[in-house]
Amino acid sequence: MTAAENVCYTLINVPMDSEPPSEISLKNDLEKGDVKSKTEALKKVIIMILNGEKLPGLLMTIIRFVLPLQDHTIKKLLLVFWEIVPKTTPDGRLLHEMILVCDAYRKDLQHPNEFIRGSTLRFLCKLKEAELLEPLMPAIRACLEHRHSYVRRNAVLAIYTIYRNFEHLIPDAPELIHDFLVNEKDASCKRNAFMMLIHADQDRALDYLSTCIDQVQTFGDILQLVIVELIYKVCHANPSERARFIRCIYNLLQSSSPAVKYEAAGTLVTLSSAPTAIKAAAQCYIDLIIKESDNNVKLIVLDRLIELKEHPAHERVLQDLVMDILRVLSTPDLEVRKKTLQLALDLVSSRNVEELVIVLKKEVIKTNNVSEHEDTDKYRQLLVRTLHSCSVRFPDMAANVIPVLMEFLSDNNEAAAADVLEFVREAIQRFDNLRMLIVEKMLEVFHAIKSVKIYRGALWILGEYCSTKEDIQSVMTEIRRSLGEIPIVESEIKKEAGELKPEEEITVGPVQKLVTEMGTYATQSALSSSRPTKKEEDRPPLRGFLLDGDFFVAASLATTLTKIALRYVALVQEKKKQNSFVAEAMLLMATILHLGKSSLPKKPITDDDVDRISLCLKVLSECSPLMNDIFNKECRQSLSHMLSAKLEEEKLSQKKESEKRNVTVQPDDPISFMQLTAKNEMNCKEDQFQLSLLAAMGNTQRKEAADPLASKLNKVTQLTGFSDPVYAEAYVHVNQYDIVLDVLVVNQTSDTLQNCTLELATLGDLKLVEKPSPLTLAPHDFANIKANVKVASTENGIIFGNIVYDVSGAASDRNCVVLSDIHIDIMDYIQPATCTDAEFRQMWAEFEWENKVTVNTNMVDLNDYLQHILKSTNMKCLTPEKALSGYCGFMAANLYARSIFGEDALANVSIEKPIHQGPDAAVTGHIRIRAKSQGMALSLGDKINLSQKKTSI
């Protein structure tokens, strides 16, 4: 056992720089010194005994000269001294001197000072000698009637401990404490007494509870918590008692203490699965979330609500509470809001979706009135996505949502506007009846759009879905308005010339000489340098984008103009109008090409954009039926296929999720005939109090996989060889932020090994909590040594060290056995996670650490290799299965995972199979890993390389 596992009541720091005092000097100070000297001497004695010194000669001195003193500090120190001093002879008999000490205990138990009485009673809880306790029993009983509650509650604790360890000393303890409990008024005393009855005589505790079950609401919160625990344990052991106590739990839901309400709600859910019980518990959880200010508490209680939702029967009850759950959105914390919106979205039904949409619309409008903040922007995105999902699931709601969301297309926050655009694109494709409304609203906000990315998307939607002659003309009008005066080059040159004239007449301040790219001189005044800012602000949006050198939007505009021109030709029969419209579209494209070739834009037009615009010009000049089909039919079909694939993917993931949630009973499962209780009823559940205690102690028992190979033996690491004098192997147990090394050490020699010490050191973000204690191993004996290691981040860590020992009777130096390195597997800390494509791209751009891993494998199938990487790295593939299906010789996929420390890990797999090398050619390519920290990126890269080596063998 390690030092941390031994029972220890007192920890005292030992100064290493001072010399230990002699027994004679201590004896002199204890006999003849003043109170201060005796106090210091007593402290030194305590430290020496803790260090292993016996000091038997000082026991009588302390009894004679220190024990009679009434100083409170000395009395406190004496309690520590009597706790640690050896009280028995080597053969186990009580020392005669302890009779005198026992008399001192009795006097302290009758002391007029309540603190001395109470602290003495607490000290008696630690005594393990029945001979010392027996004479004190009358005094301990008398303390139950003391006027002060501090004495009474410690007397209850003392009686409970003595009854548990030495029942014969006080056989009537349960009856005594029951009588005490009936007449007691103090909350802490009642709590201690009731707790003792729960563990010592549960029937008496239940009898007492039955007599006062109607007054439970008036009890203090500490007693109420114990009552909840008792009811849970009783009903867990005996489900037939549920009807007897369920009303009490209902009453405790109205307690003034949040802790009691939380525990009562959790217990009620386990006691009953009736809709009224689930509704009451859920309502209690919601009230707690709203009223508690601590965000951690809110998140914990939200998790309990989410757990309730996982049960199919409970989910139907929670659906009626969606509007109550939405009250949690008043919390400013983003994580709480995110979980709340997801929960509401999972629970929403056709009955309450209208109310949900109304609340979300109000929340969206509220975000407009709040000063711009990063969390406000993110919250707006969450609201947009939630409304998007509602509209897809409930198409009738889309008409109410669209007008509110369309206003956000002109928002400064590009991410929120992009989410709105994605929603609008899906809505206009899915809902034919809303196309007119969407086009109308899009035209209203088109001129106010500030982001070029949103502008491109809006252009595409307008070009694809304006189907009437009036809409087409409106789109052309908006484009002309957004482009400004044409031809652009001539109008810009005229504007420059027009603006320079008045400036020439004004005498301006200092004129600065500048050298142009051509090597000539140019002048620039303070006035002329400040003018462009105002001029740029006055530019129409599309013109501004083009002059800034963003010609990608011009390529998108050319496609839009081509689509609407071809559609206009099909709708209007008059040749003159057809030619006029097509000519106008071609003029706009030509003027943009001219601008791109000129020196006016900040960046010249790219060859790709020139090719695209030229192609559109050619299509309009020829107007062939084939091109008409490609532009007006094939594009829309591509979007339809993409949305169908996305919807199918979502349905598939939901189906998998529901299959996980559904608890199926196998045909060969044993049947519980008693009341034909279902498998998920309480008598088959684990004790929640016991589970939480185990979790707090780090002893959480994880469920092993069905595969027999996935046992603890898989994690045993051999540290030394079988031929070494000391054989060692370790089991690495990972428990969230801790690693426990359980090391088996075997003495393989015929000698006794003394001071056998396991010396460990760490590499990486690991920290050894304590140094394992040395031990002695008999010939061919073995022992287990435990060592705790703290983990701070997801990074490959290495634990290394050696075992040193002395051979009994040998005069040689210490012997040393070097241990093999223990590599900590980061897969224990990485969990698959999901994020949107936009979030993935944003993180990809932000993360500064990249690790590029070259593919080196014998595998010949692209999909098999991807599955191998997913299994090796514990990451989730974000790329839809449909996009990965089929065979084309290459594959690209995005992977994502998150560590338990909140670190994100991204990976992009880009692999191909060289076709010219035949069907047996190995997969080639590379994997790029990005993370915020260097350790995460390197660790994942190492993991992939290691997995590749295994496949290459």
UniProtKB/Swiss-Prot annotation:
Modifications made to the protein after synthesis: Proteolytically cleaved between Ser-528 and Ser-529 by CAPN8.
N6-acetyllysine modifications at: 494
Domain of life, source organism: Eukaryota
Keyword annotations of the record: Acetylation, Cataract, Cell membrane, Cytoplasm, Cytoplasmic vesicle, Disease variant, ER-Golgi transport, Golgi apparatus, Host-virus interaction, Intellectual disability, Membrane, Protein transport, Repeat, Transport
Modification N-acetylthreonine, positions: 2
GO BP term, example: intracellular protein transport
HEAT repeats: 96-131, 132-168, 240-276, 277-314, 316-353, 396-433
Predominant subcellular localization, coarse grouping: cytoplasm
Topological category with respect to the lipid bilayer: Peripheral membrane protein
Coiled coil: none
Annotated GO CC locations: COPI vesicle coat; cytosol; endoplasmic reticulum membrane; endoplasmic reticulum-Golgi intermediate compartment; ficolin-1-rich granule membrane; Golgi apparatus; Golgi membrane; Golgi-associated vesicle
Record's subunit section: Oligomeric complex that consists of at least the alpha, beta, beta', gamma, delta, epsilon and zeta subunits. Interacts with SCYL1. Interacts with COPG1. Interacts (via trunk domain) with ARF1 (via switch I region); the interaction is direct. Interacts with KCNK2/TREK (via N-terminus); this interaction increases the channel-mediated whole cell currents and promotes plasma membrane expression of KCNK2/TREK.
Linked pathology: Baralle-Macken syndrome: An autosomal recessive disorder characterized by global developmental delay, impaired intellectual development, poor or absent speech, and difficulty walking or inability to walk. Affected individuals have early-onset cataracts. Additional variable features are microcephaly, facial dysmorphism, metabolic abnormalities, spasticity, and lymphopenia.
Note: Brefeldin A induces dissociation from the Golgi of the beta-COP and presumably the other coatomer subunits.
Physiological role: The coatomer is a cytosolic protein complex that binds to dilysine motifs and reversibly associates with Golgi non-clathrin-coated vesicles, which further mediate biosynthetic protein transport from the ER, via the Golgi up to the trans Golgi network. Coatomer complex is required for budding from Golgi membranes, and is essential for the retrograde Golgi-to-ER transport of dilysine-tagged proteins.
Protein name: Coatomer subunit beta
